Amino acid sequence: MIEASVFMTNRSQAVRLPAEVRFSEEIKKLSVRVSGSDRILSPLNQSWDSFFLNDQAVSDDFMNEREIAFQPEREAL
């Protein structure tokens, strides 16, 4: 497991990431999602980019058996 250190700088808390897990230099802002005691950092406005640009796709059977919502018939206007 890779570890990072947390420290105070002025009145803010900062995280020092090891070189092997640093964000690229063009990333200047991050979104922070809180899940219990976890903090999940993602490049701001790019959280879906990595999914769509990733070479790995979903499996061929992804959502094959999803339920189709029933659409009730409406009265004519």
Swiss-Prot record:
Impact reported for F62V: Protein very unstable, thus loss of antitoxin activity for VapC2
The keyword Glycoprotein belongs to this UniProt entry's keyword annotation: no
Effect of R66G: Wild-type antitoxin activity
Effect of F52V: Increased antitoxin activity for VapC2
Keyword line: Toxin-antitoxin system
UniProt effect for mutating W48G: Loss of antitoxin activity for VapC2
Segments forming domain SpoVT-AbrB: 4-46
Superkingdom per UniProt: Bacteria
Entry GO MF terms: DNA binding
Disulfide bonds: none
Pfam families in the record: MazE_antitoxin
InterPro entries, alphabetized: Anti_VapB2-like, SpoVT-AbrB_dom, SpoVT-AbrB_sf, VapB_TA_antitoxins
Family: Belongs to the VapB family.
Function: Antitoxin component of a type II toxin-antitoxin (TA) system. Neutralizes the effect of cognate toxin VapC2 but not non-cognate toxin VapC2.
Subunit text: Probably forms a complex with cognate toxin VapC2.
Domain comment as written in the entry: The C-terminal 33 residues are required to neutralize cognate toxin VapC2.
PANTHER family (UniProt xref): ANTITOXIN VAPB1
Record protein name field: Antitoxin VapB2
Native source organism of the sequence: Haemophilus influenzae (strain 86-028NP)
